[in-house]
C-alpha cells in the first residue's frame, strides 16, 4: 500500500479544510469533520485500500486495516499539519461539537441496560414457544401433542416453568444490568430486584409448594398491606415489571455513591449497603413502585391500544417507518417496550410483541433490496458487499445493508419500504405476534406464537418478493444509467489491472497454506456478525469469530511473527508461519483507555510460538470505562483463502481449542 497516496486520497475525499481533528485505533482512521455532507463518499467507496466507512458519535471513521492504518495516519498528519491527538481526546472534540440530546441519551441508556439481558429473555421466549408447540390444539389434529402423548406432560410442565422464570423474575435481571450501567454494586441491584418480586414469591410458596406459577401472582399481585408509620402500603409484587426497578436501582446508585463518599472506611463496607438497600426498599414500596407501575401500565396499554385501534393499517405504516427509525438509532429503545409486551403476554394480559414482527419484515425487505443490487451492479466490490450484507440483513443485522448498499443508491432503500409496509400490514391482518425476542429475520419464526408461524413465513416471503421485484424492476428501467456507468468504469479498471492482479493473487495464494488457528483466550464464542461494532460485524476487516473472555490473558494462536503490538496493549497483529494474517482486538473501542488495564508482553517483529503469552488485560477496568470486553479474532487476509470456517461458533472455548480453519 502506498501510504502517502492513500492519505492524500482520504484527505481529498473528506476535504482538507473540512478536517478538524484526526486519531486512529487498530483498524481505522477516526476523523472529526466540520460538515459530514461534504465528504466525497463515492471516491472512498471506489478506493480499493478503503475497506469501508461509517459515522458514529460525531466521528467519521475510515476503515484501513491493522498494520497500515498507523502509517496512513502519520501521512495525514504530515500532509495536513494537524496535531496528533488520542482517541479519548478526539471523543471530547467530537462531543464538544454536538448538543446534548436527551432523547438519544435515554435510548442509549435503555440499550445499555437491556442488550445484556436479551439472551435470558430469548431463552425464556423460545422455551415458551416450544411449550406452545407441545400444548397448542389444532397443530396436529384436534388434540395437542401433550394430549396425544400424556407421557410428555411432565416435561411440558417443566418447560413451562423454565419459560416463565426469566420473565417472572425480570426485575432481578434488570436490577443487575441497571446497577452496572448506573455504577452501583450489581449484587445490590439484584437484591432490589429480589425485594420487588418477594411478596409474589412468598404468596406462591404459601399457596402450595409444588403449585405452578399462577396468574394471581402477576403484575401488582399482593398479599395484604403494611402499616408503615401510619401509611397503608400495599404488599405488591412487581414481577414482569421493568420501569419500577429501573427507577429503584437508579436511586440505589445515588444513595450508594453518597454513602461511599461520606462514611469512614471503617464502617463503609457494612453500613453503605445496609442504608442504601433499606432506604431504596422503603421508597420503592411506598412511592416508586406504585407510581412507576402506573406509568408502565399506561405505556403498555397505550401501545396495545394503538395496535388494536389502527389494526393492519397501523402495522403497515409502522412497517414503512421501521427502517428510517433504524437510521436514527431510535430502534435501540424498542427492546424495553417489547419486554413489557412479552411480559404482558406471559401473564395473560396482552396480545404479544408485534414490534418484532414488523422489524422482521423490514429487515428481510432491506436484505432483498440488497440482493437485487447484487444482480444489477457490475462493480465487483459492491457485488461482494451486497451479497454479504444481504445475508446479514436476512438474519436480522441490517446496518451493513442499509448504510453500505441501499442508502448509497437511495432507491433500493425506498423500494424496500414498499415490501416491508405490505408484509407488515398483512401480518397485522393475520394477527401475527412474537412471544419472545430473537433474530428479527428469516430465523424469527422461532420467536413467533406457534399457531402463527405459517402466516409469519408467508409474510416474510411476501416482504422479500415485493422488495426484490420493485428494486430490480426500478433498477432495470429507471436507474439503468447508474449501473451502465459502473460497468464502464469496472471494465476500464479490469483492462488496466487484470495482469498485475492475477500475478499478485497467484503470489499471495502461493504463500498461504491450510491451517487451524487456536483460541487465543478462554471464554464464550459468539458470531462475529453479532458484535456491537460495524467494522467487525460487517466483516469488513475479514472473517473470524468473537470471544467474550472469562480470563485475562491473551495467548498466541499460531507459530509466527508479531507484526503489530500496539503500545496501548489492546490489539495484536500476527502473521503465522503458514501465511495467515491475524488480528486479535481486545474489546470494543478500548483504544480510548490508552493502555490503562492492559499489559503488553511482546514487541513487533518478535517470533512467537503457539501458546506464548501476548499480553494481559483487566476486564473490570474495561467495564468501569463503560466498554465491552468482547475480543475479536479475525483473519485479515481472508481474500487469500477459499474459505475461513469457524469450528466453534458458539459455546465455551478454552485456550488452545481449534477455533478457525483457513483453506486455500
Curated annotation (Swiss-Prot):
One of its GO terms (cellular component) is plasma membrane. The keyword Repeat does not apply. Residues 108-492 form the PTS EIIC type-1 domain. The keyword Transmembrane helix applies. One of its GO terms (biological process) is phosphoenolpyruvate-dependent sugar phosphotransferase system. It is found in: Cell membrane. Disulfide bonds: none annotated. Keywords: Cell membrane, Kinase, Membrane, Phosphotransferase system, Sugar transport, Transferase, Transmembrane, Transmembrane helix, Transport. Gene3D superfamilies: Glucose Permease (Domain IIA), Glucose permease domain IIB. Residues 533-637 form the PTS EIIA type-1 domain. It is a multi-pass membrane protein. It holds the Pfam family PTS_EIIA_1. The phosphoenolpyruvate-dependent sugar phosphotransferase system (sugar PTS), a major carbohydrate active transport system, catalyzes the phosphorylation of incoming sugar substrates concomitantly with their translocation across the cell membrane. This system is involved in sucrose transport. PANTHER family: PHOSPHOTRANSFERASE SYSTEM TRANSPORT PROTEIN (PTHR30175), PTS SYSTEM TREHALOSE-SPECIFIC EIIBC COMPONENT (PTHR30175:SF4). This is PTS system sucrose-specific EIIBCA component. The gene is scrA.
Amino acid at each position: 500500500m502506498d501510504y502517502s497516496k492513500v492519505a492524500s486520497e482520504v484527505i481529498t475525499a473528506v476535504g482538507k479544510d473540512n478536517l478538524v481533528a484526526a486519531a486512529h485505533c487498530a483498524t481505522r482512521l477516526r476523523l472529526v469533520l466540520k460538515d459530514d455532507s461534504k465528504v466525497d463518499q463515492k471516491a472512498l467507496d471506489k478506493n480499493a485500500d478503503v475497506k469501508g466507512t461509517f459515522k458514529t458519535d460525531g466521528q467519521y471513521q475510515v476503515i484501513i486495516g491493522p498494520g497500515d492504518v498507523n502509517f496512513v495516519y502519520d501521512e495525514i498528519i504530515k500532509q495536513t499539519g494537524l496535531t496528533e491527538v488520542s482517541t479519548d481526546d478526539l471523543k471530547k472534540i467530537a462531543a464538544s461539537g454536538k448538543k446534548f440530546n436527551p432523547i438519544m441519551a435515554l435510548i442509549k441508556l435503555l440499550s445499555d441496560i437491556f442488550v445484556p439481558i436479551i439472551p435470558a429473555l430469548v431463552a425464556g421466549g423460545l422455551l415458551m414457544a416450544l411449550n406452545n408447540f407441545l400444548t397448542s390444539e389444532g397443530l396436529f389434529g384436534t388434540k395437542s401433542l401433550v394430549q396425544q402423548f400424556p407421557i410428555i406432560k411432565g416435561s411440558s410442565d417443566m418447560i413451562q416453568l423454565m419459560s416463565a422464570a426469566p420473565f417472572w423474575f425480570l426485575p432481578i435481571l434488570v436490577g443487575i444490568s441497571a446497577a452496572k450501567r448506573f455504577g452501583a454494586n450489581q449484587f445490590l441491584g439484584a437484591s432490589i430486584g429480589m425485594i420487588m418480586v418477594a411478596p409474589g414469591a412468598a404468596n406462591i410458596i404459601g399457596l402450595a409448594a409444588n403449585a405452578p406459577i399462577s396468574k394471581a401472582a402477576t403484575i401488582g399481585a399482593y398479599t395484604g398491606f403494611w402499616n408503615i408509620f401510619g401509611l397503608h402500603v400495599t404488599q405488591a409484587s412487581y414481577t414482569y415489571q421493568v420501569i419500577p426497578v429501573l427507577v429503584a436501582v437508579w436511586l440505589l446508585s445515588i444513595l450508594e455513591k453518597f454513602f461511599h463518599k461520606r462514611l469512614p472506611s471503617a464502617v463503609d463496607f457494612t453500613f453503605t449497603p445496609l442504608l442504601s438497600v433499606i432506604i431504596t426498599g422503603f421508597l420503592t414500596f411506598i412511592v416508586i413502585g406504585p407510581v412507576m407501575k402506573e406509568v408502565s401500565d399506561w405505556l403498555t396499554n397505550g401501545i396495545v391500544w394503538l395496535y388494536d385501534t389502527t389494526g393492519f393499517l397501523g402495522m403497515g405504516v409502522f412497517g414503512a417507518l421501521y427502517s428510517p427509525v433504524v437510521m436514527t438509532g431510535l430502534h435501540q429503545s424498542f427492546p424495553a417496550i417489547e419486554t413489557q409486551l412479552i411480559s404482558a403476554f406471559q401473564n395473560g394480559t396482552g396480545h404479544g410483541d408485534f414490534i418484532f414482527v414488523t422489524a422482521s419484515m423490514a429487515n428481510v425487505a432491506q436484505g432483498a433490496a440488497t440482493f437485487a443490487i447484487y444482480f444489477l451492479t457490475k462493480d465487483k466490490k459492491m457485488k461482494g458487499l451486497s451479497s454479504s450484507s444481504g445475508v446479514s440483513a436476512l438474519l436480522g443485522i441490517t446496518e451493513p445493508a442499509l448504510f453500505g448498499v441501499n442508502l448509497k443508491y437511495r432507491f433500493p432503500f425506498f423500494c424496500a419500504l414498499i415490501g416491508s409496509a405490505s408484509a407488515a400490514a398483512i401480518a397485522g391482518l393475520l394477527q401475527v405476534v412474537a412471544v419472545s425476542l430473537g433474530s428479527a429475520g428469516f430465523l424469527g419464526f422461532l420467536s413467533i406464537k406457534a399457531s402463527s408461524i405459517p402466516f409469519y413465513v408467508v409474510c416474510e416471503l411476501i416482504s422479500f418478493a415485493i422488495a426484490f421485484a420493485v428494486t430490480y424492476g426500478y433498477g432495470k428501467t429507471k436507474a439503468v444509467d447508474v449501473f451502465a456507468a459502473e460497468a464502464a468504469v469496472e471494465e476500464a479498471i479490469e483492462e488496466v489491472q487484470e495482469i498485475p492482479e492475477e500475478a499478485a493473487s497467484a503470489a499471495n495464494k502461493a504463500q498461504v497454506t491450510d491451517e487451524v488457528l487456536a483460541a487465543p483466550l478462554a471464554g464464550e464464542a459468539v458470531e462475529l456478525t453479532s458484535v456491537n461494532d460495524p467494522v467487525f460485524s460487517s466483516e469488513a476487516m475479514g472473517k473470524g469469530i468473537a470471544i467474550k473472555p472469562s480470563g485475562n490473558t491473551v495467548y498466541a494462536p499460531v507459530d509466527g511473527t508479531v507484526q503489530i503490538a500496539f503500545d496501548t496493549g489492546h490489539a495484536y497483529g500476527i502473521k503465522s508461519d503458514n501465511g495467515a494474517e491475524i488480528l486479535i482486538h481486545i474489546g470494543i473501542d478500548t483504544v480510548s483507555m490508552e493502555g490503562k488495564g492492559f499489559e503488553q508482553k511482546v514487541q513487533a517483529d518478535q517470533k512467537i510460538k503457539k501458546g506464548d503469552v501476548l499480553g494481559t488485560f483487566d476486564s473490570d477496568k474495561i467495564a468501569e470505562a463503560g466498554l465491552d470486553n468482547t475480543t475479536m479474532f479475525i483473519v485479515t487476509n481472508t481474500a487469500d483463502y477459499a474459505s475461513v470456517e469457524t469450528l466453534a461458533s458458539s459455546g465455551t472455548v478454552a485456550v488452545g481449542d481449534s477455533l478457525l480453519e483457513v483453506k486455500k
